[in-house]
C-alpha cells in the first residue's frame, strides 16, 4: 500500500500539477467533448464517429431520429461524471431499447436531448450542446466482467509519460456507467505489462466481480501499447501537461472471422480524480515527482520511461518461483541494441537504488543510441555540475530476465563495469561469501 507522503491530495493536484501544467485554452478543450473530438480529428486520433450535434431546439425538431443506426449514444458536451449519457442498445418496434432495458420512443429521445440543451447535466449549470455518436461495444475480453455498459481504460499522463492507469468496469449498481462514485469497479493496471493488479469498489478492495467468481486481477488489456500511445498523443494534442485520457476498445470481426479492436478516445479529463491511487495501491505524488522536469522528446520515449519507472514487480510472484540465491559478485548477461547477449561480471548492491553501467560499455553495446536514452539528469558533485543519462537495459541474472532503466556512469577505475541496484533484485537472496567479503566493486 502507498505511504502517506506518496499520496496526491486534492490541493496538491490543483496547485502543483493541474494549475501549473494545464493552460486555460487546453482546459476548455477538455471540458467540451465536442471540442475534444474536433482536436483529436485534426490530430488523426481515433474517437467514436460523430453522427449529429445539436445547438438549438429547432435543430432537434428538424432532425429525423429514425435515420440513426440501430445502436448509438446520446451525450452532453459538457457533462460531468457520466450524467446525461444515454446508451441505446437496439431498435424495438417503433422505438429503441436502452442498455438498462428501458423502452424509448422518438419523443423520449427528443426530450432527453432538449434537457441536455437546457443545461440539466452541464458541469456549469449553463445551456449545453448535445450530440449523438457511435456506440463502443463491449470487447469480448470484458464481457464476463461488465454489466450493461462499456468498460474503459483511464491513463493518467504527465509530461508525456503514462504514470498510472486503471480499468473501469460498469456494474448493475452503477447502471452501466463507468463511474466509481456510483458503484463501478476500478482495477489498477501495471503500466509495463497492461495487466490488472488489484481492484476496488468505492473504497473497499475486492477480488471478484460482483455475484461471480471472476477474478479482477490478472486481466490483460488488449492492444496495451496502442492504448498507451493513443493516450499520450491525445494529451499532447490537447496541450494538457497533466490529464487523464479515457480509452475504450471498439471490437470488430474481419471477413476472415478474426477479432480486431481499435482503441478510441472517449474523453480527456483536465482534472482527473484521485481514486486511481486506491485501485493501484500506489501514490501519485511520488510518481509525478519522478517525471517532473524530464525532457521527453518523443511519444515512444515517454511510454518507455513510464514502463521502466512504474512497472509492478510483485514480490509474491517472485516467491512463487522460489527465492534465487546469489552472491555480491555474479556473472550476468547484458543484451545489446541488436538483441545479442554479452557476459560480464557485476556487483549486486542493495545500497544502490538504481542499476548503473559503465559509459564505455554502454556505448559499445549500443545502449547510448538516442532512441534508447530514457532521460537525462543534472546533478552536483565534487567535480561540479554533471550530466547523467539513464538508458533502457535488459540483462539476465541466474537465468532471470530483467528489463530496467540504468544510469550511465564512469566506472573505468572500478573492477566491475556494472552494478545491479536493489530495484532489480526482487526475488533474489544475497549471501555474502567469505571470499567476497573484502573485495571492492
Predicted features and spans:
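Short, His- and charge-rich active-site/binding loops that engage polyanionic ligands
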Residues: 75, 85-109, 158-205
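Pepsin/retropepsin-fold aspartyl endopeptidases
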Residues: 290-441
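A short, polar/proline- and glycine-enriched secondary-structure boundary/capping micro-motif
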Residues: 173-182, 275-280, 366-369, 414-418
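Active-site nucleotide/adenylate-binding loops and adjacent lid/helix of ATP-dependent enzymes
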Residues: 8-22, 26-152, 159, 351
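A long amphipathic alpha-helix within ATP-dependent nucleotide-binding catalytic cores
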Residues: 119-147, 175-253
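C-terminal active-site "lid" helix and adjoining low-complexity regulatory extension at the edge
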Residues: 218, 222, 249-322
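A short acidic-Thr-Gly-centered motif at the start of a beta-strand
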Residues: 62-67, 237, 250, 254, ...
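Short, surface-exposed charged micro-motifs
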Residues: 154, 246-248, 345
Amino acid at each position: 500500500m502507498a505511504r502517506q507522503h506518496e499520496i496526491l491530495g486534492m490541493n496538491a493536484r490543483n496547485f502543483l500539477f493541474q494549475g501549473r501544467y494545464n493552460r486555460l485554452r487546453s482546459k476548455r478543450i477538455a471540458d467540451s467533448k465536442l471540442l475534444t473530438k474536433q482536436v483529436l480529428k485534426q490530430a488523426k486520433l481515433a474517437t467514436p464517429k460523430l453522427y449529429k450535434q445539436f445547438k438549438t431546439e429547432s435543430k432537434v425538431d428538424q432532425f429525423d431520429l429514425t435515420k440513426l443506426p440501430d445502436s448509438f449514444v446520446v451525450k452532453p458536451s459538457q457533462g460531468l461524471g457520466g450524467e446525461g449519457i444515454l446508451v441505446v442498445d437496439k431498435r424495438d418496434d417503433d422505438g429503441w431499447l436502452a442498455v438498462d432495458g428501458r423502452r424509448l420512443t422518438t419523443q423520449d429521445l427528443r426530450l432527453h436531448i432538449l434537457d441536455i440543451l437546457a443545461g440539466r447535466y452541464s458541469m456549469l449549470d449553463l445551456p449545453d450542446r448535445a450530440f449523438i455518436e457511435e456506440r463502443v461495444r463491449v470487447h469480448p475480453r470484458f464481457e464476463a466482467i461488465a454489466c450493461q455498459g462499456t468498460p474503459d481504460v483511464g491513463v493518467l499522463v504527465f509530461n508525456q509519460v503514462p504514470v498510472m492507469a486503471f480499468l473501469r468496469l460498469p456494474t448493475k449498481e452503477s447502471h452501466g456507467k463507468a463511474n466509481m462514485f456510483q458503484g463501478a469497479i476500478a482495477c489498477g493496471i501495471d503500466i509495463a505489462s497492461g495487466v490488472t493488479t488489484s481492484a476496488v469498489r468505492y473504497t473497499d478492495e475486492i477480488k471478484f466481480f460482483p455475484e461471480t467468481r471472476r477474478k479482477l486481477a490478472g486481466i490483460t488489456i488488449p492492444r496495451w501499447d496502442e492504448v498507451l500511445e493513443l493516450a499520450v498523443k491525445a494529451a499532447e494534442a490537447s496541450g494538457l501537461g497533466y490529464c487523464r485520457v479515457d480509452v475504450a476498445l471498439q471490437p470488430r470481426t474481419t471477413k476472415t472471422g478474426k477479432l480486431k479492436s481499435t482503441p478510441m478516445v472517449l474523453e480527456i479529463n483536465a482534472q482527473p480524480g484521485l481514486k486511481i491511487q486506491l485501485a493501484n495501491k500506489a501514490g501519485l505524488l511520488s510518481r509525478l515527482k519522478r517525471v517532473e522536469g524530464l525532457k521527453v522528446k518523443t511519444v515512444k520515449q515517454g511510454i518507455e520511461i513510464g514502463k521502466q519507472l512504474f512497472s509492478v514487480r510483485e514480490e509474491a510472484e517472485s516467491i512463487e518461483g522460489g527465492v534465487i540465491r546469489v552472491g555480491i559478485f555474479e556473472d550476468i548477461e547484458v543484451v545489446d541494441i541488436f538483441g545479442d547477449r554479452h557476459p560480464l561480471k557485476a556487483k549486486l548492491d542493495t545500497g544502490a537504488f538504481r542499476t548503473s553501467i559503465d559509459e564505455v560499455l554502454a556505448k559499445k553495446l549500443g545502449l547510448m543510441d538516442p532512441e534508447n536514452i530514457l532521460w537525462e539528469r543534472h546533478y552536483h558533485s565534487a567535480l561540479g555540475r554533471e550530466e547523467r543519462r539513464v538508458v533502457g537495459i535488459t540483462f539476465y541474472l541466474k537465468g532471470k530476465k530483467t528489463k530496467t532503466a540504468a544510469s550511465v556512469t564512469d566506472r573505468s577505475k572500478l573492477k566491475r563495469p556494472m552494478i545491479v541496484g536493489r530495484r532489480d533484485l526482487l526475488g533474489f537472496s544475497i549471501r555474502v561469501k567469505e571470499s567476497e567479503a573484502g573485495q571492492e566493486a
